[in-house]
Each structure stands twice: as C-alpha cells, then as structure tokens.
Amino acid sequence: MKLSAWHKAQGDSVEWYEPLFSGHMDKVYMSKVFSFTPDYEYFVNADEVIKGGSGYCIELVNGKEVYHKERDAGLPYEVEHIYPDYSIYYGKVKDIENTAYGRLTLGCPRGCAFCHTGVKDGLRSHKVADLSEFWIGQKNIVLLDQNILACKDWKPLLQQLIDSGAYVDFNGGLDARLVTEEKAEMLGKIRIKTIHFAYDRYEDKKTIEPKFRTIKELTGWGRSKVQVYVLVNHTSTPRQDLERIYFLRSLDFSPYVMIYDKDHTKQGSFVRHLQRWCNNRFLFWSIDNFDDYEPWRKSAEYRKIESEVNQ
C-alpha cells in the first residue's frame, strides 16, 4: 500500500500484476512473510522484478530458521512514512474502506529463539510513527506492532488510540509479562475489537499467569475479544501445552495454537490434532477435554503419549 502510494505520487500507474492481462510492466514487486510460502514460479513480463519481505530472508539450517538481515532491504524512509494507498485492496479485503493498517512501534527486547523480530527490527521497541501517519478517521484500526508495551512511549501511543474512538485490533501478540495495572486500565479504555497476547514459553508460567489474571480483573474481557497465541513444538511438552491452554480457557480467553516448524510435523501428530481442536472455536468451546476430541483419541499418537500427558 505504501509502495503504491509512493509510485502514484510520482505519476506512475499502479495495478495488481495479472500475467494474462497486464502485459509488459516496467517494475513488479513481489513479497512474502513466511519462508514456506511457495515462490511465484511463472515468467514475469517486466523490466525489473523486486522481491522483498521476511519470507525471502529466512533459511532453514539444521532444522532451525535463520534470518539473514543483509537480504532485507526494507523501504526507503520516504516510502515507509507515506500515507498508505488503501484503494488497491478495495474489493479484495473485507471492509478495507473503513479500516486503517499500520504500526506505531518496531522491535522487541526479548530476543526469543523462535522469533526473528529482534534480528530484523532490533532488540528494542521504539516508536516509528504517530497514528495520524496511517489513520484519518476510519472506524477500524488494525495494529501490526510486535511489542508496543515495551516501548518507552507506550503511554502517549495508547492515548492516541483511546482518543481516536476507533475500534482497534491489536493483531500482533502483546507481551502480557509487561502488563501493569496502569497499562491494563489504559487498554481497557480503548475500543477493542480484538486483542492478541502471547503465552509462548511454559517457563514464564509464574510471571505471565498473574498478568493474565490482572487483565481479566481490570478489563472484564472474554473470549470474544481476547485471543492468546500459544507456541507448541518448540521446547514445551504436551502436558505443558495443555496446561497453558486450559489455564487460558479458565479465564474465558481463546487460545490459538501456533506450531513451530509445522512443515516438519506429521499429519497425525499431537500438535496437529491440538491445533485443529483448539483453533476451531466451535470444537474448543464444546469439547472441554482434549482427550475427548475423537480424532485425537482414535489416533496412534494418542496411545504413545497418553501416559506423559496425564502423569
């Protein structure tokens, strides 16, 4: 959207590339977020093809994803800070006419082994924009920040969201470990459409679970607003995965399972069944116990790890 806005400001014509209809183009941009997304395999009729995005910067080395920052050119300042051209998504993304997308901060101080944010955007959450850079009164705002609560400017930035009066979707997982009563109270003043947190590491149990209780007590939010990313297949055991999921359910929060290195897991594995059960809200809220989820109970993997899960 920003590239489109910048090119149009230079007098260029911008359109989605359609091989059968576009004809010859001067320049075509291609991007992808994830390394497992297949690349475009057909001929591109253009003088120049520019590829960008995290998906082109990640390699799997000895079973571990490695991010190559030197491959990530990023956007020039004048492009990064231009008001986005939302019109290119009209008819393609639901309610795009009434929704603003952007980020107020970049970076995260955590440096988690399973995440590329620290390498890509720095081990510090820092302000990169005010809300007015990508929002001009739309009724909805989708935020793509990685760790806004770690930014030293969190308070004025949250105040901007409060003052907007717009419905806000915190699409990135907020760091619940950084929640204080003051932060929870300010979050509670925002017109939340959806808010995402993360419970990635079982090792954080003693720190993070009291924070989730504080969020519940001060906001009263439930499953319709709160979704919590739960990382599995990294360092946790099946028992620890279920323990985190059941805890979140006890607060009426919706857990959402994210499988690390999913491409190298088997279809009938524990984590695949867990993801299907947990991420289907109808199944999750109607089947209280994972062991009562019939496809899992009938699987060979169930018999193999039943004793470990229930010990």
Protein language model regions, located:
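Canonical Radical SAM [4Fe-4S] cluster-binding loop centered on the CxxxCxxC motif
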Residues: 1, 94-132
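A short, structured N-terminal alpha-helical element that caps or precedes a catalytic domain
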Residues: 1-51, 56-58
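A general structural detector for well-ordered alpha-helical segments in enzyme core domains, enriched
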Residues: 3, 39-45, 157, 182-186, ...
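Anion (oxyanion) recognition and catalysis
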Residues: 8, 162, 246-250
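Short, charged, surface-exposed secondary-structure boundary motifs
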Residues: 26-28, 40, 58-75, 113, ...
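Core AdoMet radical
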Residues: 29-33, 116-211, 223-234, 254-258
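Ser/Thr/Gly-rich flexible loops in soluble cytosolic domains mediating phosphotransfer, phosphorylation
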Residues: 49-90
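A structural motif corresponding to the C-terminal lobe/cap of the Radical SAM core domain
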Residues: 189, 194-196, 203-311
